[in-house]
Each structure stands twice: as structure tokens, then as C-alpha cells.
């Protein structure tokens, strides 16, 4: 864009405006490009599958590379240069994201299934099958698979079963399985377990007083941790309200106490919005105020009960309570609770090492125990009371992951988090035989399924073939013939399958090779939903890019090979057209490759190179400029417009 150097003398200027366009492609050619992107991502993720899966090294800017066997980490690290290939990869990344969000594990399984369904669907549609019928057949088969998984599922009842699930999800690491089994045993199946970096070579388990609830920060602007989107405070104050907070005056006293004590402040309320939230965010961003607003958990009467538990555990006064008439606007230091540590994410809040007031926590625990002793209580109320009692009495299990280096600790933490998520999923919906065997046991039921049309049957067959892939991939990563293993397992029954670690066929459940039902159900659902849509795609629309034009406009004609030797010769023709003369090269900028003088002069801007106090408006019109510019190779998509310099 060219701007006047003498605004008073020139009332208008011209700019080169890019006429942005879209690249629209049709048919099997663009589908093939997307499938190629799916293949690249799935190949990278699949190598991590099973107990003998390999590791992947991911480059990270400004820090050491990450070594991981976590399929989700690998999937989200991939971005392909080709736009259409990248679209395919991104769609499968969405599958991994959804599976990780819902089940916390199984992203590798979901990716392998998605690739199989997408490729087979693409092949069938290329041969003339109806895309809509194919998708219907796929989703019909998935419903049958989910029903059969539910029938096969067995509830997790013992510590040994929990330990087996954790060990398998941690790629066969028995130490991780033992640690998670012990932690679950101490805080209960639905207790809170968190993972942190350790300070020693060995892993450690600590049980500390604390509780966790399911709501997190109100705004991401409160995040202060470089490791994930979290808020982490030490030695923080806690302010609690049962009512909504909208005005700044409601929280001023609490903020003053926080500043006087030089301690972070956590505000828990039904909702925080308006002037109050704006002021907190603004002060956090501008002044570094250590504060975080959190929405209180649950709803209705249950919310009031949980707020009471938080108050008892931290020693905070509950403002807005019908029993307590204390005003938030008059909050004193003794009205604020205290915690030794707080970890807040977008979905959850964990308050550790609270400092309750004398006798109040014991009274709260006794009150819950008395309610549990009543015989006329409903089953769902009894479950809630047990969860609350566990949170107040058993505390929080903290797993400190040790190692000889940061890379080793991070790799192990990924596996521990996966194992924890798998354990929670198993407790929630039960377990089925592992190693891909549960999917193989669903195939005979799909083969017996009667459909209305041939294309619908093809959709069912696509799922039948895809269900073989998890077992086949695990076997291939173990160095054996995958299809042969699948055939042998299919000839067996129930939990008979292949143990990749021991390289033998056995009863998998007896050997502790099991998968959480929720993980498999989520994986097949997410994979089929996205992959079947991908294979039915007929048109792909992307942003059109003209690399030659971008190179010419940016003056990057000389490339970047020799330091920053950026030649602005690409703009010579434009400069000549506008009467500005040549701008020369940009050599000589220290050791950066040279940015030579901006010679060539600004030819019509005054004698001796100086700027004149006035400038002529004579010159080519916008229409003439358009014709001259479009005559330059690669500049056909550029348009010249007159714009008012007063708007600059």
C-alpha cells in the first residue's frame, strides 16, 4: 500500500487490495488427497498402539523435544503443508479430541478405526455406491456394536482389576498400575487422584487433605500456568457466596484483604459476571492481580450442600446464606477460608490442604454420617452422601512422577494420565476383553444383520472390516503377522485372544488384558461419525493461495537461504508504475545477510532526494493503474483502488 508523505497536499492515495478467492474442488480427486492426509496421521498414531508400540518424538519450539507414546499428543502435533491433506488429518484429529474429551483414553483406537472406515467408504463410493446409504449402514452397524459391548461388559469390583486396567493403558508398566491401584484403594473408586512432577527418581504416592468439584474458572484470562490451561495458587484465600456476584462493590473488601496479606484470592459463587468479572480480568491482565473466579458446583439444594462442604474444609464464611447474615461488602480476614494449594482448570477445581476452623469439619462429617444412617433415604441421595463423605475424609491422592530428566518425566506422566482416565472409565461402565478382541467378537453379529439394500450392507461390511484393525495393529507392532492373528482370534470364543507382550494366545481376562467398555464405545462412535461423513464428501472449499504473488508482494524474491537476504526487487515494477522510482536492494544489516541501501531514490518527491512541501496529483488514474498492474505476471488478482487518506 502506498501512502502520502504529505497528507495536507494529497487528499487521496491508492492501495493494492488483494481480491481473495476460494479454491473449490470436486469429486474423487480431492477425496483422495484428504484420505492421504488421514493415512499420514493414522500411520504416525498407530505406531504407539499396544504394549510393544513405539515412541514418537515431537519437536517443540523453545524447549526440548517431547518423547511420547500417547496417541492424542501425536495426533494434535501434526499439521500438513498441503491444504487438502491437512483437512483430512484435522477431521481425524477431531475424532481423537472427542474421544479424549469423553473417555480420556482410546484416541489411538479411534484413529485406527476412523482411517479404516474412511478409506473403505471412499473405495465403495468411488465404485458407484450411494454415499447416504453407506453412511446409514455404518451407523446401523455401530449401534449393534455398542449393544454387544454393553452385553459383554463386566463391572470392576476389585483392586486387582483396577490395577490391570491401569497397567494395560500404561503400555504394560506394572509399576504405574500398582501405584494407581493403591491410590484408588486409599481414596475410593470415585475419589480424586491427581498427577504432578516428582522431585526424586522414583514415583511416590501422597494422600493429602483436600477436595475437588466439577466446575472451573469463569474466564480463561485467569490462567497463570505455562503447563496447560490451569490456574495454580499456593497459600490462597477463599471467598464463598451462595448468590450471584455482579457488582465490584461486593468483592472489594475481599480483594483488599488479599492485597494486604499478599496472597491469591479464589472467589466461588453461583455466577460472576458484569462489572465484577470485568474488573477482575482487567486487574489480572494489567496489574498481575492473583485472583480467580470460580462457578460453584452442581445446582439447587445439592449446590448448597457442596458449598457447605467447601466452607467446612477451608474455614470460609458462606455469604448470602439464609442462616448467616454477614454481608460480602463487609468481609473481614476471618471470613475468608485458606488453602495450601489450589489447581483450577476450565472443568474442575481442586482445593488442597485447607485450614478448617476448629471443630467445624468434624461436625460436618458427623452430620453426613447421621444422614447416611437414616433408613428412609433414597438410593441416589445415599450415593451423593457417600461421595461427599469420601471427599471430606479420604482426601486427595497425589502421584508424584519421578525420573532422571524432564523428557522422561513428561513421557511417563502422559502414560499415567492415560491410565488414570482408563481406570475411571472402567469404574463407570465396566470392562471387556482387551487387545481388540471385544471388537472381533461383535463381527459375527454384524454378519448376521439383514439390511434393506446392497449399499446399506456395504456400510455394515465397512464396519466389519474396520473392527479387525485394532487387533491387527497391535499384532503388527509386536512384530507378528496381523491378519493371521485376527483370523486365529476370530476362530476362538469369549475372551480368547492374543497377548502381544507374551506373544501367546490365552484367556485375556484371566491374564489381566482388559479394556474399559466406555473407551471402546466412545472410540467406535466418534470414529464412525466423522469418517463416514469424510468418505461421503463431494466438494471441498479452501482458501486460494498464490505463492508467487505473495512472494512478489512481500519482496521475498531472493529467498531466505542466505540469512535474511530479502530482495525487494519484486516491487520494482510497482514502484516504477507509481512514480516512486526503484527501492533498490536491502543488503547489509550486520550479520543477518545484508539489507543494502534503500537506493534508487524516491524519484518524484523533491529535488536532491528531499521531500517537497507539495506534490502533484498528476499520474495514472485507478483504471490505468489497474491495467498496468494486471499486466505484471502473477498480479492478475490484484486490484488498485482510490482510498481517502483521511481514513488512514
UniProtKB/Swiss-Prot annotation:
Domain of life of the organism encoding this protein: Eukaryota
Localization of this protein: Mitochondrion matrix
Single GO molecular function: ATP hydrolysis activity
Similarity comment: family membership: Belongs to the chaperonin (HSP60) family.
The protein's name in its UniProt record: 60 kDa heat shock protein homolog 1, mitochondrial
GO biological process, one term: protein import into mitochondrial intermembrane space
Residues of the transit peptide: 1-55
GO CC terms of this entry: mitochondrial inner membrane; mitochondrial matrix
Family annotation (CDD domains): GroEL (cd03344)
Keyword terms: ATP-binding, Chaperone, Mitochondrion, Nucleotide-binding, Transit peptide
Function of the protein: Prevents misfolding and promotes the refolding and proper assembly of unfolded polypeptides generated under stress conditions.
PANTHER family, per database record: 60 KDA HEAT SHOCK PROTEIN, MITOCHONDRIAL
Species, as recorded: Drosophila melanogaster
Amino acid at each position: 500500500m502506498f501512502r502520502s508523505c504529505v497528507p495536507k497536499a494529497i487528499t487521496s492515495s491508492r492501495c493494492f487490495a488483494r481480491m481473495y478467492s476460494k479454491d473449490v474442488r470436486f469429486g474423487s480427486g480431492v477425496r483422495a488427497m484428504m484420505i492421504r492426509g488421514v493415512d499420514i496421521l493414522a500411520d504416525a498414531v498407530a505406531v504407539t498402539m499396544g504394549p510393544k508400540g513405539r515412541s514418537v518424538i515431537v519437536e517443540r519450539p523453545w524447549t526440548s523435544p517431547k518423547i511420547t507414546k500417547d496417541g492424542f499428543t501425536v495426533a494434535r502435533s501434526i499439521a500438513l503443508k498441503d491444504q487438502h491433506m491437512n483437512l483430512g488429518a484435522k477431521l481425524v484429529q477431531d475424532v481423537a479430541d472427542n474421544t479424549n474429551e469423553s473417555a480420556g483414553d482410546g484416541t489411538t483406537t479411534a484413529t485406527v478405526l476412523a482411517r479404516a472406515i474412511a478409506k473403505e467408504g471412499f473405495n465403495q463410493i468411488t465404485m458407484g455406491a450411494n454415499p447416504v446409504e453407506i453412511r446409514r449402514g455404518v451407523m446401523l452397524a455401530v449401534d449393534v456394536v455398542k449393544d454387544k459391548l454393553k452385553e459383554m461388559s463386566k463391572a470392576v469390583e476389585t483392586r486387582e482389576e483396577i490395577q490391570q486396567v491401569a497397567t494395560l493403558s500404561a503400555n504394560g508398566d506394572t509399576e504405574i498400575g500398582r501405584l494407581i491401584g493403591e491410590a484408588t484403594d486409599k481414596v475410593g473408586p470415585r475419589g480424586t487422584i491427581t498427577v504432578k512432577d516428582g522431585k526424586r527418581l522414583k514415583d511416590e504416592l501422597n494422600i493429602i487433605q483436600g477436595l475437588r468439584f466439577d466446575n472451573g474458572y469463569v474466564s480463561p484470562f485467569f490462567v497463570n500456568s505455562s503447563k496447560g490451561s490451569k490456574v495454580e495458587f499456593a497459600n490462597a484465600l477463599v471467598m464463598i457466596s451462595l448468590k450471584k456476584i455482579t457488582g465490584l462493590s461486593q468483592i472489594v473488601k475481599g480483594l483488599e484483604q488479599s492485597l494486604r496479606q499478599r496472597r491469591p484470592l479464589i472467589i466461588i459463587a453461583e455466577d460472576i459476571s458484569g462489572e465484577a468479572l470485568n474488573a477482575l480480568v482487567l486487574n489480572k491482565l494489567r496489574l498481575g492481580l492473583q485472583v480467580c473466579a470460580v462457578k460453584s458446583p452442581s445446582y439447587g439444594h445439592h449446590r448448597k450442600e457442596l458449598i457447605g462442604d467447601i466452607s467446612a474444609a477451608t474455614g470460609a464464611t458462606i455469604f448470602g446464606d439464609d442462616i448467616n447474615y454477614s454481608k460480602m461488602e463487609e468481609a473481614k480476614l476471618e471470613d475468608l477460608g485458606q488453602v495450601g494449594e489450589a489447581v483450577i482448570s476450565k472443568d474442575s477445581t481442586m482445593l488442597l490442604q485447607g485450614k478448617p476452623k476448629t471443630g467445624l469439619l468434624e461436625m460436618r462429617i458427623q452430620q453426613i454420617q447421621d444422614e447416611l444412617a437414616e433408613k428412609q433415604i433414597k438410593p441416589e441421595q445415599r450415593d451423593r452422601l457417600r461421595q461427599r463423605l469420601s471427599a471430606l475424609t479420604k482426601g486427595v491422592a497425589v502421584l508424584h512422577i519421578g525420573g532422571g530428566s524432564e523428557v522422561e518425566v513428561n513421557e511417563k506422566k502422559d502414560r499415567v494420565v492415560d491410565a488414570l482416565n482408563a481406570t475411571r472409565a472402567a469404574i463407570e461402565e465396566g470392562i471387556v476383553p482387551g487387545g481388540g478382541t471385544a471388537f472381533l467378537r461383535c463381527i459375527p453379529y454384524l454378519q448376521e444383520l439383514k439390511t434393506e439394500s446392497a449399499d446399506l450392507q456395504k456400510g455394515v461390511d465397512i464396519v466389519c472390516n474396520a473392527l479387525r484393525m485394532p487387533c491387527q495393529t497391535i499384532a503388527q507392532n509386536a512384530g507378528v503377522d496381523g491378519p493371521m492373528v485376527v483370523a486365529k482370534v476370530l476362530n476362538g470364543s469369549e475372551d480368547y485372544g492374543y497377548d502381544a507382550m507374551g506373544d501367546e494366545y490365552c484367556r485375556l481376562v484371566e491374564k489381566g488384558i482388559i479394556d474399559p467398555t466406555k473407551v471402546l464405545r466412545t472410540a467406535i462412535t466418534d470414529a464412525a461419525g466423522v469418517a463416514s461423513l469424510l468418505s461421503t464428501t463431494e466438494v471441498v472449499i479452501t482458501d486460494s493461495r498464490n505463492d508467487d504473488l505473495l512472494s512478489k508482494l512481500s519482496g521475498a524474491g531472493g529467498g531466505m537461504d542466505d540469512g535474511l537476504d530479502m530482495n525487494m526487487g519484486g516491487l520494482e515494477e510497482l514502484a516504477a508504475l507509481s512514480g516512486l522510482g526503484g527501492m533498490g536492494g536491502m543488503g547489509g544489516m550486520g550479520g543477518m545477510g545484508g539489507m543494502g541501501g534503500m537506493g534508487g531514490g524516491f524519484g518524484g518527491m523533491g529535488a536532491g532526494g528531499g521531500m517537497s512541501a507539495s506534490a502533484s496529483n498528476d499520474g495514472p488514474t485507478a483504471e490505468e493503474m489497474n491495467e498496468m498492474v494486471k499486466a505484471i505476471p502473477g498480479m492478475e488478482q490484484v486490484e488498485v483502488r482510490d482510498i481517502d487518506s483521511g481514513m488512514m
